[in-house]
Curated annotation (Swiss-Prot):
<keyword id="KW-0007">Acetylation</keyword>
<keyword id="KW-0378">Hydrolase</keyword>
<feature type="short sequence motif" description="Involved in the stabilization of the negatively charged intermediate by the formation of the oxyanion hole">
    <location>
        <begin position="81"/>
        <end position="83"/>
    </location>
</feature>
<dbReference type="Pfam" id="PF07859">
    <property type="entry name" value="Abhydrolase_3"/>
</dbReference>
<feature type="active site">
    <location>
        <position position="165"/>
    </location>
</feature>
<comment type="similarity">
    <text>Belongs to the 'GDXG' lipolytic enzyme family.</text>
</comment>
<dbReference type="GO" id="GO:0005829">
    <property type="term" value="C:cytosol"/>
</dbReference>
<feature type="active site">
    <location>
        <position position="302"/>
    </location>
</feature>
<dbReference type="InterPro" id="IPR033140">
    <property type="entry name" value="Lipase_GDXG_put_SER_AS"/>
</dbReference>
<dbReference type="InterPro" id="IPR050466">
    <property type="entry name" value="Carboxylest/Gibb_receptor"/>
</dbReference>
<dbReference type="InterPro" id="IPR013094">
    <property type="entry name" value="AB_hydrolase_3"/>
</dbReference>
<keyword id="KW-0719">Serine esterase</keyword>
<feature type="modified residue" description="N-acetylmethionine">
    <location>
        <position position="1"/>
    </location>
</feature>
<dbReference type="GO" id="GO:0106435">
    <property type="term" value="F:carboxylesterase activity"/>
</dbReference>
<comment type="function">
    <text>Carboxylesterase acting on esters with varying acyl chain length.</text>
</comment>
<protein>
    <recommendedName>
        <fullName>Probable carboxylesterase 13</fullName>
        <ecNumber>3.1.1.1</ecNumber>
    </recommendedName>
</protein>
<feature type="active site">
    <location>
        <position position="269"/>
    </location>
</feature>
Length: 329
């Protein structure tokens, strides 16, 4: 019967013996809005017709309604949502609320990328889709792409990538690949990316990254099981370099293709030491970036700002996030 459970990954999803997958979170969607929300308008655009994949673009209303002939050029944020590679979308109320707040606070253009999720589409599909989206975004660099908002308003000398949890993991890998594959013309820089923001990044390893990381068997087993479901073909499990970015000696961060990095961690997040470890490893590498910051929110857990976006600490996170994009000191 369809009600027979094969695997229970609550609170994320349930897999039934029939093969049906029931996602328990992140399936509700909200439409984009041409009516300003917090001073921001949005619309959805297809970036991969072959796979029927879209992204949501956010633009400050004042830029959208500017009557001057000279287009208003703004920093460009490309955002990858979290959800363990398993749940959530770029169109959920959670991410629509966050991106609207971030764009309002930072006065930027934002592209929120939707990608195919595991287990139906295991790793590396999410990376492949994200790369396709990033290339689509950069097709507008000369002002002649298919999307007018990017042609008119995106300043490609100020491109920022960001994401939370699994989206932060994707952000890291896209930035490495952008430098390696020379995403941008050399007239800007080879990667085309000015900076990245990793919010509560989902990195992991079979053994603790330091003596402060949790050794709780249940917690470690759960985190590893999420990765195993997302990437069943990883021969090294959670020591796969896709997830074991911090501890793995095979991962060289010196090639990170950006000049500025902000790592945001939360004190009570099981992933907190991975975020600190990334910051430390990058700082000790031969990376030639200019800015490397880490911010820890005390007393809060994983993606607390998405669960309670109206809290004071969530507002502080958005303020710091936006300040990094604006170049605030």
């Amino acid at each position: 019967m369809d009600s027979e459970i094969a695997a229970d990954y609550s609170p994320m999803l349930i897999i039934y013996k029939s093969g049906r997958i029931e996602r328990l979170v992140g399936e509700t969607t909200v439409p984009p809005s041409s009516n300003p929300q917090n001073g921001v308008v949005s619309k959805d655009v297809v970036y991969s017709p072959d796979n029927n994949l879209s992204l949501r673009i956010y633009l400050p209303e004042k830029a959208a309604t500017a009557e001057t002939e000279a287009s208003v050029k703004l920093p460009l944020l490309v955002y990858f949502h979290g959800g363990g590679f398993l749940v959530e979308t770029a169109f959920s109320p959670t991410y629509h609320t966050f991106l609207t707040a971030a764009v309002s606070a930072s006065d930027c253009v934002a592209v929120s990328v939707d990608y195919r999720r595991a287990p139906e589409h295991p790793i590396p599909t999410s990376y492949d889709d994200s790369w396709t989206a990033l290339k689509w975004v950069f097709s507008h660099i000369a002002g002649s792409g298919s999307e007018d908002w990017l042609n008119k308003h995106a300043d490609f000398s100020k491109v920022f990538l960001a994401g939370d949890s699994a989206g932060a993991n994707i952000t890291h890998h896209m930035t490495m690949k952008a430098a390696k594959d020379k995403l941008s013309p050399e007239s800007l820089n080879e990667s085309g990316i000015s900076g990245i923001i990793l919010v509560h990044p989902y990195f992991w390893s079979k053994t603790p990254v330091d003596d402060k990381e949790t050794t709780d068997v249940a917690i470690r087993t759960w985190i590893e099981s999420v990765w195993t479901l997302a990437s069943p073909n990883s021969k090294d499990g959670s020591d796969d370099p896709f997830i074991n970015v911090v501890q793995s000696e095979s991962v060289d961060l010196s090639g990170l293709g950006c000049g500025k990095v902000l790592v945001m961690v939360a004190e009570k997040d099981a992933l907190v030491r991975q975020g600190w470890g990334y910051w430390e490893k990058l700082g000790k590498s031969r990376w030639n970036g200019e800015v490397l910051d880490v911010v820890e929110t005390k007393g809060e857990g994983h993606v607390f700002h998405l669960r309670d976006p109206n809290s004071e600490k969530a507002h502080e996170l958005v303020h710091r996030f936006a300040g990094f994009i604006k170049g605030d000191k």
